[in-house]
């Protein structure tokens, strides 16, 4: 293949005079090219003309073509140490200048956006979408929660050494390759063979508009779904954590649902993006019956992993209230969930030591729950943990009956996110008679600031990953 063949191929692909093109390339992909690296660059410039611009990335070792462009006498290089671009041609300076003033390396004010706004193109010469840096611009425009920051000490355009930070900076793995068919099917990308190279020419503005639309619908649009990819698992967790942070409620998970051993629980909670755990069972043993040292070790392990214990749930009334209070204080647990019953004296013992006591309904009717709560009325705090499964097992509709009869909006501190059928069969969320969807919906209407606990007070018919998916679907359909 000769230089003239490359010129012809680029024109047939859609490039024309005065265009701006950002090229990502592999010189070797052209195969038996009868010419030099400079001949490839000259072929592009003969198509673009003196008023066009050929832009290449130079923020790392990205191949011989970018290096040769960077070495040209008439080159203009953007002034930043991250996302750096070099360009030649009449429009290169206009596109690349001002990169230093942009708050992000790839977003607003960056050359990547300027190329798109000017109607420019992205050319992938013998490389795939994995090299398409402008896709990071879509992430930056969306301000996706898994993006980080990049800080560098470098010389400013005035020659002074400064330290500055670029926000919404991309991190590790993406599944940009998986976006290729979407571009092709949408008609914003032309694909052709030039020599041995598969060449893609993409309309930059249309690509960004499409990617932002995809990202608005699904913030994980650029991530892979491989459970063995730790990078994308972590980034998906950041998306979920950000979503929950924008809710009024706080989300916790029962330790029984999180796993068997504490290290396993930590790994799964972090993978899900959940920062709170409610202690009920660890290694198959009820936390109620653990000694203070065991509890403290568990709490400390979670704390080291930046996971906070939201409460300890006891399924029985402690016989030795003072001893139970003592080990909770030693372990650093400041909230306990107890079965609802006449327990004013014991509850007072917790309150005196600064431990919050919340009561949960277990096999009681709504009216019985109200009466039991009245018996602890002398306490400053009279808070209720609403268990849909508990009311189902008591033969009452949790929302249509119990919620209204008990007027629990006045006392609720936590909603246990669980579900069952009338005959006691455990179900995934909103698949039983627990009316969990209605309960979550009404709490959101009130901007409820208390706890929602996945698997609280009842087993879940699956693992934590499945529970989070079910809960996400629940939120999506409200």
Where are these predicted regions, by residue range?
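N-terminal and secondary-structure boundary signal
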Residues: 1-246
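Short, conserved active-site loops that position catalytic residues or coordinate cofactors/metal ions
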Residues: 19-28, 57-58, 272-283, 313
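Structural preference for beta-strand elements that scaffold enzyme active sites
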Residues: 20-22, 248-252, 276-278, 306-313, ...
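Active-site-proximal loop/turn and secondary-structure-junction residues that shape catalytic pockets
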Residues: 27-29, 60, 257-259, 281-283, ...
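Catalytic-core regions built around general acid/base machinery
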Residues: 39-48, 293-304, 345-353, 438-443
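Histidine-acidic metal/acid-base catalytic patches
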Residues: 246-255, 259-273, 292, 327, ...
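Active-site acidic/histidine proton-transfer and metal-coordination neighborhood
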Residues: 264-267, 308-394
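Glycine-rich, proline-tolerant flexible connector loops at the mouths of alpha/beta enzymes
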Residues: 278-299
């Amino acid at each position: 293949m000769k230089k003239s063949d490359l010129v012809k191929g680029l024109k047939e692909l859609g490039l024309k005079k005065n265009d701006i093109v950002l090229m990502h390339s592999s010189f070797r992909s052209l195969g038996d090219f009868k010419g030099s690296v400079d001949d490839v660059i000259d072929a592009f410039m003969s198509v673009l003309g003196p008023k066009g611009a050929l832009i290449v990335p130079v923020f790392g070792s990205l191949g011989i073509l970018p290096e040769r462009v960077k070495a040209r006498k008439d080159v203009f290089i953007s002034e930043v140490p991250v996302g750096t671009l070099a360009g030649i041609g009449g429009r290169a300076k206009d596109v690349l200048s001002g990169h230093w003033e942009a708050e992000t390396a790839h977003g607003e004010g960056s050359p990547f956006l300027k190329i798109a706004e000017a109607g420019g193109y992205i050319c992938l010469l013998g490389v795939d979408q994995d090299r398409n840096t402008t896709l990071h611009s879509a992430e930056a425009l969306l301000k996706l929660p898994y993006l980080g920051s990049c800080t560098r000490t470098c010389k400013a355009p005035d020659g002074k050494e400064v330290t500055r930070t670029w926000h919404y900076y991309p991190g590790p793995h993406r599944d940009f390759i998986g976006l290729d068919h979407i571009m092709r099917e949408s008609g914003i990308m032309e694909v052709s063979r030039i020599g041995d190279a598969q060449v893609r020419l993409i309309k930059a503005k249309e690509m960004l508009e499409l990617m932002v639309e995809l990202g608005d619908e699904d913030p994980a649009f650029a991530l892979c779904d491989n459970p063995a990819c730790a990078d994308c698992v972590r980034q998906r967790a950041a998306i979920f954590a950000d979503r929950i942070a924008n809710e009024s409620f706080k989300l916790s998970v029962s330790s029984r649902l999180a796993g068997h051993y504490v290290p396993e629980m930590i790994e799964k909670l972090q993978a899900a993006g959940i920062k709170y755990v409610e202690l009920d069972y660890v290694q198959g043993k009820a936390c109620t019956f653990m000694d203070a040292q065991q509890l403290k070790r568990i709490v400390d392990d979670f704390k080291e992993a930046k996971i906070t214990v939201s409460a300890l749930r006891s399924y029985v009334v402690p016989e030795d209230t003072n001893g139970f209070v003592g080990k909770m204080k030693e372990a650093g647990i400041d909230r306990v969930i107890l079965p609802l019953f006449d327990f004013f004296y014991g509850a007072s013992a917790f309150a005196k030591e600064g431990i919050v006591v919340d009561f949960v309904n277990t096999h009681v009717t709504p009216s019985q729950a109200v009466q039991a709560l009245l018996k602890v009325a002398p306490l400053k705090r009279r808070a209720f943990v609403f268990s849909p499964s508990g009311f189902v097992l008591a033969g009452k509709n949790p929302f249509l009956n119990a919620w209204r009869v008990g007027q629990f909006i006045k006392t609720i501190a936590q909603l246990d996110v669980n579900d069952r059928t009338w005959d006691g069969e455990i179900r995934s969320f909103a698949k039983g008679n627990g009316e969990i969807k209605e309960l979550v919906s009404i709490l959101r209407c009130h901007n409820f600031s208390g706890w929602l606990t996945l698997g609280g007070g009842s087993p879940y018919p699956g693992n934590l990953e499945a529970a989070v998916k079910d809960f996400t679907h629940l939120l999506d359909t409200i």
